[in-house]
Amino acid sequence: MSSKEHSPEKPWRGFYGPNLGAVIELYDQYVEDPNSVDEQTRAHFEKWGPPALEENVSSSNAKETIGADMISAVVGAVRLADYIRAKGHLVSDIQPIWKTDKNSNLLDYDRFNVTEEELKKVPVKLICKDAPPHLKNGLEAIEHLKKVYTQTMAFEFGHVQDEEERNWLRKQVESEAYADELPNKEKKALLERLTSVEGFEKFIHRTFVGQKRFSIEGLDTLVPMLDKAIREVRKEKTDHVMIGMAHRGRLNVLAHTLGKPYKAIFSEFLQAPNKLNAPSEGLGETYTGWTGDVKYHLGADRQISDDKSAQTIVSLANNPSHLEFVSPIVEGYARAAQEDRSSKGAPKQDTTRAYSILIHGDAAFPGQGVVTETLNLSRLNGYHVGGSLHIIANNNIGYTTEMHDSRSTTYASDPAKGFEIPIVHVNADDAEACVRAIKFAVEYRRKFQKDFLIDLIGYRRFGHNEGDEPAVTQPDLYAQIRKHPTVRAIYAKQLEAEQVITAKEAQKLDTDMYNYLLEEYNKVNSDKSEKKYELSPPDFIVDGLPKVKTAVEKEKLVAMNEQLLDWPSSFKPNQKLEKILKRRANAFDGEGNVDWGLAEILAFASILHDGTPVRLSGQDSERGTFAHRHFVLHDRETNETHVPLQTIKDANASFAVYNSPLTEQACVGFEYGYNVFSKETLVLWEAQFGDFVNGAQVMFDQWVSAGRAKWGQKSGLVVLLPHGYEGAGPEHSSGRVERFLSSAAENNWTVANCTSAAQYFHILRRQAKILQKNTVRPLIIMTPKSLLRNQVVASPTSAFTEGEFQPILEEPTLGHDPNAVKRIILCSGKLAIELQDYVNKNDEDWSWVHIIRVEELYPFPRRAIRERLKEFPNLEEVKWVQEEPKNMGAWTFMEPRIREILPSGVPLSYIGRTYRSSPAEGVSNAHKVEQKRIVTESLTRKN
């Protein structure tokens, strides 16, 4: 019942459709048994009688109160209408190959106890409030609903919880507001586009026999759909359209949506020189690294300009064959493009500035977990982009796997329902319906700023790749597909029937397209010279990082520290936390004592002062997993928040920090994408514990480590991985440094394990300084846990106001007499502090040993270590000491590199845990025994 009172009017005044139907059904129930309804409802019926149509609908044949003989018919009509809305998609014409049984009794009238004659007596508006004006009665309204809900477009939005959205969606469908009739000019243009799409595929099929191209045929309408989407969003003066897709149909999208010249694509098939393949101005600008990638993984940018004031860049993201993983990266692109980071405070987001389109596969959409991870980002504060357009390029098969083996749902799109995303299924053979679906989607996003999904249902004309014979595993299906006309042929026949074009004109389009493609091919084929490949990175990458100034004057540090502690007078943080943070006011007294947390926030404050925006995200990153950070303060009385880094006076760029969802894969992808697009921004992703970084392994393997070598895609992403063996077990000990080192080559990233607050400060500032430079690269830092509050890690003021990041550090109390040193211990991270602690606590003669901490594991500090080793003339041995197992940690990476630089005759050996399948002990006492053994053995002098 409505809570709104209309007294003295009847309480159901204004009800219509399903709501009025529910009241009528209740009244029918009341007539049969008054006690079957609740007391309040019974009182309403006793006072007001049955619902009257005249107050709820404006219809000439609805002037009387519903008689008892019509109540059952009205209830049936309303239930039937709702059933059509909910289930019409099950009998819709959305399958090009597998035709739906339109004679199904699913929507038969007798199932709802209503006849055609009775329906004629039911007012139109009772059934369909937004029906077109030409409908005369309930029967026509029902037939109208059947038509709009069971045609080549089918709709699912009953799972959308917001009533305003649901009503808007229903109105769009039932009024057919989205379904504008295309003028003949646009119909001809659509046929021309389909001719280009099909002609391109056929030409490659005939010319490059058996070569992989992952044809779009069967889903040809995807290209005109993208055309329509770009045209629609450009009406909002959108700056960027970001597209993510896999390899199916990618070459066609590159050629037609991105404008990559045909001859450039042909040259990739021929592996010909590319001097003829420079793209036209503003079209199809593609990028490759020095090792490159296959042609159907490459991305491109295209600039579209109607006039000087309206310019849009369309980007297709580079993508490996790991299906769906590009989705969060594209979302990161879009968010970065939408935000203004040029002034202090939080970034200012304008969702009209960028639009993301994600093209999925029907097997991968329900099959890959990164899909739902990405969908979950869609309405989160730190990640939303104002709605993305999802298109499932649904060819009803995954390689050789059929639907019943690839998903447990009715539709490939069903996972989207859990996120309340409206779904339109559309038959890929109906070109005009496909274009209309795009208009529907763009209008929804414009109004509600949420995701929309189009399930584009077609088929795959050939095998998974063109060297594959699909009839081996799907003989019946491919017997049907071979007889099935192409999308272009179907649409050409339609336009001939509508007398928009003649058969001769349609044929001429086809012939002209072939001749043009042949002309472009001959331009490439005429050059027979052999192409030379350069597989080495450019010199500026080989040469390493430039020297940059990272020290900051004491006066600036003190001023920034004061501003960070200058909270609004009315703001009341947690009292215990307030005391802890206020202690920082004295951090620069005397020689100074700056701990890790203060060094971090001062690094960011100084980076903002320099005009570099900062974005940090991760699980619990606002506070910090180990409660050391507190970038977001909470008022203990009002729960309002205060972000000190957004209020410092001298900041010249924005700062953002977000607690991420419990997701690694999509979040790393998002931050990588954000960073790639926003090259001027220091973007950091932090793992809750370093152990969980392998939840994003694909992102590191395919993008972060190799993106530049494959695609020329620069990134300065910073990854913070809490790492260290402290008895917390195999899930809370290791950031898997060995995995990052195993992929370390060609200066593709920096891997560091810092042991002082100043080192952390300098390496963050160095990273910010190299952004937008050719030498930029990702930075992987193994960050501390227990050391966060260890005073040994704190640094004096001079360490921040002087110097720079050092790739190696030496134990300050050792090595003063080089002639006495017999053993040098090389180590990294927390264990170095434990070794130092052991030395300090044991009053012995330690002149025979020296400890060198390797702070930068990659690039390997060859020169620094080699030059230092030369200074110990009586050196007898070098030990690499680590707390990780021998097959993990840095040993495997470091051993051959250290051996290359050892003084002649000096042996290298290992001290640490033995080979293990699990990274750490699960029993605290066992951990302590191992840790003690490693430290003791390292610092025990041999006889």
Curated annotation (Swiss-Prot):
Its cofactor is thiamine diphosphate. E1 component of the 2-oxoglutarate dehydrogenase (OGDH) complex which catalyzes the decarboxylation of 2-oxoglutarate, the first step in the conversion of 2-oxoglutarate to succinyl-CoA and CO(2). It is an enzyme of class 1 (oxidoreductase). One of its GO terms (biological process) is tricarboxylic acid cycle. GO terms for cellular component: cytosol; oxoglutarate dehydrogenase complex. It comes from Shouchella clausii (strain KSM-K16). Belongs to the alpha-ketoglutarate dehydrogenase family. Its EC number is 1.2.4.2. This is 2-oxoglutarate dehydrogenase E1 component. GO terms for molecular function: oxoglutarate dehydrogenase (succinyl-transferring) activity; thiamine pyrophosphate binding. It holds the Pfam family Transket_pyr. Keywords: Glycolysis, Oxidoreductase, Thiamine pyrophosphate. Homodimer. Part of the 2-oxoglutarate dehydrogenase (OGDH) complex composed of E1 (2-oxoglutarate dehydrogenase), E2 (dihydrolipoamide succinyltransferase) and E3 (dihydrolipoamide dehydrogenase); the complex contains multiple copies of the three enzymatic components (E1, E2 and E3). SUPFAM superfamilies: Thiamin diphosphate-binding fold (THDP-binding). It catalyses: N(6)-[(R)-lipoyl]-L-lysyl-[protein] + 2-oxoglutarate + H(+) = N(6)-[(R)-S(8)-succinyldihydrolipoyl]-L-lysyl-[protein] + CO2. The keyword Phosphoprotein does not apply. It comes from the Bacteria. The keyword Oxidoreductase applies. Disulfide bonds: none annotated.
